[in-house]
UniProtKB/Swiss-Prot annotation:
Gene, per the UniProt record: guaA
UniProt entry tagged with the keyword Nucleotide-binding: yes
EC number(s) recorded for this UniProt protein: 6.3.5.2
Keyword ATP-binding: yes
Pathway: Purine metabolism; GMP biosynthesis; GMP from XMP (L-Gln route): step 1/1
Keywords: ATP-binding, Glutamine amidotransferase, GMP biosynthesis, Ligase, Nucleotide-binding, Purine biosynthesis
Functional summary from the UniProt entry: Catalyzes the synthesis of GMP from XMP.
Gene Ontology MF terms: ATP binding; GMP synthase activity
Binding site for ATP: 223-229
Residue stretches in coiled coil: none
Name recorded for this polypeptide: GMP synthase [glutamine-hydrolyzing]
Domain named GMPS ATP-PPase: residues: 196-387
Domain Glutamine amidotransferase type-1 as annotated: residue spans: 6-195
């Protein structure tokens, strides 16, 4: 987005980098995440109000450490280093960083030594979140300590320039003063104004789409999820009948979702939607496959194949619309460091390079919560916009083991009961994500006087604000009892229900 009222975040591979950006956006200030090794010349020629250096998994004293050009600190814009970012500042200003004998992971008490600028309107003592194995042993030249914990220097600032460092993470909710501190940096130190508004984004996006597309046609893969649906409505608002949406019914969606939702969309927003019934093709391709990564790749490749078959039939199509959002963009350019792939993202790996379309991604600057607010502003139903996330591969990653038509039907029915009961108890909007998993495990049961031998289903519900960490939902026992009773009595083929009480980490939210 073209604006001078923005913050640039240089990413050194921290798991919390996206959180920093979200917290800045929450302050209604636009920000972008760039790789740490972005050319200094590009940074120099970019209009901005401030720079934030993220945390990261490396150590500044290692041979292959992620470092930046020291000239960055001569750009006359405020700089805030967080965790590893503070250690870089220290290292490049002749400070000493070394491995701590007593490492800090978790809650820590912060004691502020200087309540000016960065710590204005913040209590002298507060709870913060630490996550570091290294610490500053010797202060960098021309810097002073402005906060400490029991074990280490927790914050520093340059005596003349607007350069600051924090050893803790202000972006995580565990740091109670975090948002006030970021507000102090963004508004008081950098001089930003709260001008990042969804209504202004929509207006600018519509103008950009019209200018870019002209009289060409656009085709969009519409899944029925929030991102692609908001993208469709935004594109349609800009170019109307020039947009054609293609819905590929994989047969792996929730009961009463997908096409049912899109028919309402079609009616309300006058969208042109082509429906492709491809259930049999997906079942055939997935027959005998049990490995979750194989499932994801098969589904992704087949989806693209079917979509392409239909897209090339449409006249004068020059553009392919995608509901790419900012976390996808960040992931594509982020610094991975030593971290391993947990599971492949269902949006990655995608389109053939020889596809005869140009990409148009009107949501690529937005985080998920901003996409939802955009949907609301465009008139999309609140219940739809705020529905729980659903994985791209659909129920295929909620059926552990081989996928069959019978298992899909069982899972759809059980899942619908759980969702219905959450709505009935007014709890659906109180949890972040809820679903049922079908296990390849059968057990003996008794229904009336008859012995049964049925599948085991797992009920899963989590609470989270960012989906990077999550706690299992403390749902009322009475609700769980009702859900269990309804599933085993109404879904013939499932005779045992368990409740997953694993948080993230160590688990992931989805099972596959």
């Amino acid at each position: 987005m073209k604006t001078t009222n923005k913050i640039i975040i240089l990413d050194f591979g921290s798991q919390y980098t996206q959180l920093i950006a979200r917290r800045i956006r929450d302050l209604e200030v636009y920000c972008e995440v760039w790789p740490y090794n972005t050319a200094l010349e590009k940074i120099k020629t970019t209009s901005m109000k401030g720079i934030i250096l993220s945390g990261g998994p490396a150590s500044v004293y290692e041979e292959d450490a992620f470092l930046i050009d020291k000239q960055l600190f001569e750009l006359k814009v405020p700089v805030l280093g967080i965790c590893y970012g503070m250690q870089i500042i220290s290292h490049l200003h002749e400070g000493t960083v070394q491995r701590a004998t007593k490492q800090e992971f978790g809650f820590s008490e912060l004691i502020i030594d200087n309540q000016e600028d960065l710590f204005a309107n913040i209590p002298v003592k507060s709870q913060v979140w630490m996550s570091h194995a290294d610490y500053i042993e010797g202060m960098p030249t021309n810097f002073i300590q402005i906060a400490h914990s029991e074990n280490s220097i927790s914050a520093i600032k340059h005596s003349e320039k607007k350069i600051y460092g924090l050893q803790f993470h202000p972006e995580v909710t565990h740091t109670l003063i975090g948002q006030q501190l970021l507000s102090n940096f963004v508004f008081n130190i950098c001089g930003c104004q709260p001008k990042w508004k969804i209504t202004e984004f929509i207006s600018a996006a519509i103008t950009e789409i019209k200018n870019k597309v002209g009289t060409d046609n656009v085709v969009l893969a519409l899944s029925g999820g929030v991102d692609s649906s908001v993208c469709a409505v935004l594109l349609h608002k800009a170019i109307g009948k020039q947009l054609t949406c293609i819905f590929v019914d994989t047969g792996l969606l929730r009961q009463n979702s997908g096409w049912n939702d899109l028919q309402k969309f079609q009616e309300k927003f006058k969208l042109n939607i082509i429906k492709i019934n491809a259930q049999e093709r997906f079942l055939t391709a997935l027959k005998g496959v049990t490995n979750p990564e194989e499932k994801r790749k098969i589904i992704g490749n087949l989806f693209i194949e079917i979509f392409n078959e239909e897209a090339i039939k449409i006249q004068n199509v020059k553009w392919l619309g995608q509901g790419t959002i900012y976390p996808d963009v960040i992931e594509s350019v982020s610094v991975k460091g030593p971290s391993a792939t947990i599971k492949s993202h269902h949006n990655v790996g995608g389109l053939p390079k020889d596809l005869p379309f140009q990409l148009i991604e009107p949501l690529r600057e937005l985080f998920k919560d901003e996409v939802r607010r955009t949907g609301e502003a465009l008139g999309i139903d609140f219940k739809f916009v705020y529905k729980h996330p659903f994985p791209g591969p659909g129920l295929a990653v909620r059926i552990i083991g081989e996928i069959t038509a019978e298992k899909i039907a069982l899972l759809q029915a059980a899942d619908q009961i759980f969702i219905d009961e959450l709505y009935q108890a007014n709890l659906y909007d109180q949890v972040a994500q809820a679903f049922v998993v079908l296990l390849p495990v059968q057990s003996v049961g008794v229904m009336g006087d008859v012995r049964t031998y049925g599948y085991t289903a797992v009920v899963r519900s989590v609470d989270t604000t960012d989906f990077m960490t999550a706690n299992w939902s403390r749902l009322p026992f009475e609700l769980l009892e009702k859900v269990s009773a309804r599933i085993v009595s109404e879904v013939h083929g499932i005779n045992r229900i368990t409740y997953d009480i694993t948080s993230k980490p160590p688990g992931t939210i989805e099972w596959e």
